[in-house]
Amino acid sequence: MVLMKDEVEVIGFDDAPFNKADKVCILIGTYMRGNRIIDGIYFRKFKKDGMDVTEKIIDIVKEKHYKKIKVIFLAGITFGGFNIADLWEINKETEKPVIVVIDKYPNKEKIFLALKKYFDDADERIKLINSFPEPEKMENIYVQYVGADKEFVKNVIKKTKLKSKIPECLRISHLIGRGFLGLR
């Protein structure tokens, strides 16, 4: 078993809801100690369906709390439509484990059809998605991870959940994102 303090420092990223007509989306990062103490909230704008969310995530992680952050959580691999977070690049540039948490196993066939229909660079995006580890079921969620082993992932998820099935940093980023709905 991997030993880890209860207040392990993590950051979780999600995007705010967006409309079809939007060209820009909002990325939310919540930095927490364990599952109870919020020590930072970060925002970045990124292009809907672009390919810039990876650099935005890296920029946030490398800010004030960089040395303290032990894990980067992502609420999926796509943000703002099909802006794909490159797990390998995030891990390489930050030297931190990256853990993707999702509710359901993704329907890759459906995703790839949409990419081929709407994107000139669909092959590049599909290749990137296919390079990631397959999602695996862990209790009642699915996870993909880079830069960590399964035991570490199980342990850090357990330490960062409160009453939800997902880590608090992701839950709070999601809640903050929903707050942007009122601004429309």
From Swiss-Prot:
Taken from the record, one Pfam family name reads DUF99
Which InterPro entries does this one have?
A: Endo_dU
Family from the record: Belongs to the UPF0215 family.
Task: Kindly provide the name given to this protein in its UniProt entry.
Answer: UPF0215 protein MJ1150
What is the organism field in this record? Answer: Methanocaldococcus jannaschii (strain ATCC 43067 / DSM 2661 / JAL-1 / JCM 10045 / NBRC 100440) (Methanococcus jannaschii)
